[in-house]
Swiss-Prot record:
Name of the featured protein: Large ribosomal subunit protein bL31
Cofactors required: Zn(2+)
Positions contributing to Zn(2+) binding: 16, 18, 37, 40
Gene Ontology cellular component list: ribonucleoprotein complex; ribosome
Cofactor note: Binds 1 zinc ion per subunit.
Organism: Actinobacillus succinogenes (strain ATCC 55618 / DSM 22257 / CCUG 43843 / 130Z)
Binding partners and assembly: Part of the 50S ribosomal subunit.
Gene that this polypeptide is encoded by: rpmE
Length: 71
């Protein structure tokens, strides 16, 4: 690698809005704030909600189906 052209790889602190602090390394060079992390993201905590589409697929198929065809 050429010397002097690559950014410095420094240790930074990523702080989540839930209070979790993660130490990592980055070329960014400054600490960052996160909205979600592995401790508070709904997918990882098991508190994920299922969004009910309420028959939207059936409504779409009804609107755009070709008349005279059956499955």
């Amino acid at each position: 690698m050429k010397q002097g052209i690559h950014p410095e790889y420094k240790e930074i602190t990523a702080t989540c809005s839930c209070g979790n602090v993660i130490k990592t390394r980055s070329t960014l060079g400054k600490d960052i704030n996160l909205d979600v992390c592995g401790n508070c993201h709904p997918f990882y905590t098991g508190k994920q909600r299922v969004v009910d589409t309420g028959g939207r697929v059936e409504r779409f198929n009804k609107r755009f189906s070709i008349p005279g065809t059956k499955k």
